[in-house]
Structures are given as structure tokens and as C-alpha cells.
Amino acid sequence: MSTQFDQVSVIKKANIYFDGKCVSHSVLFADGTKKTIGVIFPSTLKFNTGAAEIMELNAGKCRIRLAGATDWETYEGGQQFNVPANSSFDIETIDTLDYVCHFV
């Protein structure tokens, strides 16, 4: 994945979830696609998805459990994980997570 996004629009207003434990900004591309870039501070949270997502981790460490799974999987900076559409996942952030969420 690239280290920067060129020729994009960034929504100035932050998306703040879970009392500030997750903060992101929306990035809009000329082709109509959208991504969010943000951080998740150490916590355990549950996210619901509409569109399928690819979570690209730039830095930090977390454990995730997809809907219906019993086991947790560990991910860290330089890795990514996929979340199906209309689903959910639990995330335990061990070290502050710097991420890009790609909506697919």
C-alpha cells in the first residue's frame, strides 16, 4: 500500500467514536471512493460494518475477532485484515493503532 494519497479531499470534521477512543478523518477520491485514516487508542471496542472493509495497519498492535469467530487474531503495523460487509468485529487495541480503512 502507498505511503500517501495524492489529489484527494479531506473532510475537516473528525469522526469521533467511543468517547474519543477512535478518531478518524474521511478522505474522498476523485473516482468517488472513500477511505478513513485514524487512530484507535488502547481499548476494547465493537465495530459494525456496512460495506466490506480492508483495515490497513500503519503502526500499533491489536487483536481482532470477526463476527461468529471464537478466536482472537493478533495484527500489528505493516499488516492488514478484511472485514465482510454487513458484519462486525471486536478489536482490542494493545498499542495505539494508526490505520487506514479501505471501503470495498
Swiss-Prot record:
This is Pyrimidine/purine nucleoside phosphorylase. It is an enzyme of class 2 (transferase). Belongs to the nucleoside phosphorylase PpnP family. InterPro entries: Ppnp, RmlC-like_jellyroll, RmlC_Cupin_sf. Catalyzes the phosphorolysis of diverse nucleosides, yielding D-ribose 1-phosphate and the respective free bases. Can use uridine, adenosine, guanosine, cytidine, thymidine, inosine and xanthosine as substrates. Also catalyzes the reverse reactions. It catalyses: a purine D-ribonucleoside + phosphate = a purine nucleobase + alpha-D-ribose 1-phosphate; adenosine + phosphate = alpha-D-ribose 1-phosphate + adenine; cytidine + phosphate = cytosine + alpha-D-ribose 1-phosphate; guanosine + phosphate = alpha-D-ribose 1-phosphate + guanine. GO terms for cellular component: cytosol. The gene is ppnP. One of its GO terms (molecular function) is uridine phosphorylase activity. Keywords: Glycosyltransferase, Transferase. Its EC number is 2.4.2.1, 2.4.2.2.
